[in-house]
Swiss-Prot record:
ADP binds at G108, T109, N110, T257, G444. This is Hexokinase-2, chloroplastic. The gene is HXK2. It is found in: Plastid, Chloroplast stroma. Residues 1-30 form a transit peptide. It comes from the Eukaryota. Its EC number is 2.7.1.1. Fructose and glucose phosphorylating enzyme. Transmembrane segments: none annotated. Residues 39-490 form the Hexokinase domain. It catalyses: a D-hexose + ATP = a D-hexose 6-phosphate + ADP + H(+); D-fructose + ATP = D-fructose 6-phosphate + ADP + H(+); D-glucose + ATP = D-glucose 6-phosphate + ADP + H(+). It comes from Nicotiana tabacum.
Length: 499
């Protein structure tokens, strides 16, 4: 079987790097001063709202197409835009797990180590504790051994501070759930080959190697009695963390800087799965849904942004619904309105505003929360970001733009969720819509943008109808991926039959 690349979804609401090629900055255009700014801008806003519209037929098409692409991706590798990657996670936490387990979350310039003491059905999570460690910049360009030795050393220091409610059973090896948020070919529940480093890392001697082996060997060199029992991505860990508390969780979605979704799939519904690879009736499938593109309502601003990105024609769903891009789409609309419609008065394009990514999604979220009479928060953001003073008419237009882009993003995300649920329901009537089904959500975009959340829920309700949608619970699972990795270490422990 050919193995497919898995890549992480961003949970953070902070945009740390631009996904754009280096392009020359547009020249600042001085236009004639217009009277009646709102009239000049109105046609641009009207067209934007029309192009971004997501009425029920559009949502239904997106949901149906998502389900079709899922099936094609499950049939054969490369069968659709959706990679439908096998997680090799066949054993999910049940609540019976007991003991002390660790998690390591490596996904950027910081990594996090966590431990959890589990007490079985009665006590569940007795205690948790974590630390965040910054990776020295020189180690981002060091050798594989140097980087993993540093990580193992910090793990060792953290493990030495055990005490109080944390107790390791005598004679046991400490087991770790390893969340590795870089492109990797997963080959088993505890092995995966690194494709390449991203996010500013250029570590030598790791590409093509098993990252679990690299970490295990480093821990051995440090003399630690620790080993990895589960390698997971953040979306899968989120599902596991939520499932531990609620057995009705069937889907997990991350909506942050990036986005992804995974779900519990029947093994007999995966034609590309090698025979006898799993003894379990179910496994978790990582959809990599950011690559979906079928029937999405796109604007001239989306197409322009995509063409200038480092991956044109790719990750179109992600570019319409995730935190990395919403602010950038709004910025591009504002540039056109300033250029063509004299939005900010004086008929000029603010120099700061022509810089890609200068307007972030947290900025448009903040503007949309402004309920003051004069939209003072909007005025402040525009002045700080664009360096211009705005009148009330311009501020109202900006809020309308933010709402239009957030509305489309939230509703398309909701349609994607329904597409996943729809596919599962078609395979087994009643298994999803005939009972309570939970979708666990994580990520800063979902957590911190209330209008986006509302639009997502609205779309789900519209598509499913009021009766069926009562059975579908969409709930926030804050930081579920951290504890989820430790829980997967417990669920896949070599000591699993000891409790």
């Amino acid at each position: 079987m050919s193995v497919t690349v898995s890549s992480p979804a961003g949970r953070s609401f902070h945009i740390s790097r631009s996904p754009y090629k280096k392009i020359s900055k547009p020249r600042v255009i001085i236009a004639a001063v217009r009277s009646g700014v709102s009239l000049a801008v109105a046609p641009i806003l009207t067209k934007l709202q029309k192009d971004c519209a997501t009425p029920l037929p559009v949502l239904r098409h997106v949901a149906d197409a998502m389900a079709v692409d899922m099936r094609a991706g499950l049939a054969v590798d490369g069968g659709s835009d959706l990679k439908m990657i096998l997680s090799y996670i066949d054993t999910l936490p049940t609540g019976n797990e007991k003991g002390l387990f660790y998690a390591l979350d490596l996904g950027g310039t910081n990594f996090r180590v966590l431990r959890v003491q589990l007490g079985g059905k009665e006590e569940r999570v007795i205690a948790t504790e974590f630390e965040q460690v910054s990776i020295p910049q020189e180690l981002m360009f060091a050798t594989s051994e140097e980087l993993f030795d540093f990580i193992a050393s910090e793990l060792g220091k953290f493990s030495q501070s055990e005490g109080g409610k944390f107790e390791m059973q005598q004679g046991r090896t400490r087991e770790i759930g390893f969340t590795f948020s870089f492109p990797v070919k997963q080959t088993s529940v505890k092995s995966g080959i690194l494709i390449k480093w991203t996010k500013g890392f250029a570590v030598s001697g790791t590409a093509g190697k098993d990252v679990v082996a690299c970490l295990n060997e480093a821990m051995e060199r440090q003399g630690l009695g620790m080993q990895v029992s589960a390698l997971v991505n953040d979306t899968v860990a989120t599902l596991a963390g939520a499932r531990y508390w609620d057995n009705d969780v069937m889907v997990a979605v991350i909506l942050g800087t990036g986005t992804n979704a995974c779900y519990v799939e029947r093994v007999d519904a995966i034609p590309k799965l090698p025979q006898r690879m799993s003894n379990s009736p179910e496994t978790i499938v990582n959809t990599e849904w950011g690559a979906f593109s079928n029937g999405l309502p796109l604007t001239e601003f989306d197409r322009e942004m995509d063409a200038e990105s480092i991956n044109p024609g790719e990750q179109i769903f992600e570019k319409t619904i995730s935190g990395m891009y919403l602010g950038e789409i709004v910025r591009r609309v504002l540039v056109k309105m300033a250029k063509v419609g004299g939005l900010f008065g004086g008929g000029y394009v603010p120099e700061k505003l022509v810089t890609p990514f200068v307007l972030r999604t947290p900025d448009i979220c903040a503007m949309q929360q402004d309920t003051s009479r004069d939209l003072e928060a909007v005025e402040s953001v525009l002045y700080d970001i664009a360096g211009v003073k705005s009148d009330l008419s311009a501020r109202k237009t900006v809020v309308d733009i933010c709402d239009t882009i957030a509305n489309r993003g939230g509703r398309l995300a909701g349609a994607g969720i329904v597409g996943i649920l729809q596919k599962m329901e078609e395979d087994s009537k009643g298994v999803i819509f005939g009972k309570r089904t939970v979708v666990a959500m994580d990520g800063g975009l979902y957590e911190h943008y209330p209008q986006y959340r509302e639009y997502l829920q609205e779309a789900v309700t519209e598509l499913l109808g009021s009766e069926i949608s009562k059975n579908v619970v969409i709930e926030h699972s804050k930081d579920g991926s951290g504890i989820g990795a430790a829980l997967l270490a417990a669920a896949n422990s070599k000591y699993e039959h000891d409790y």
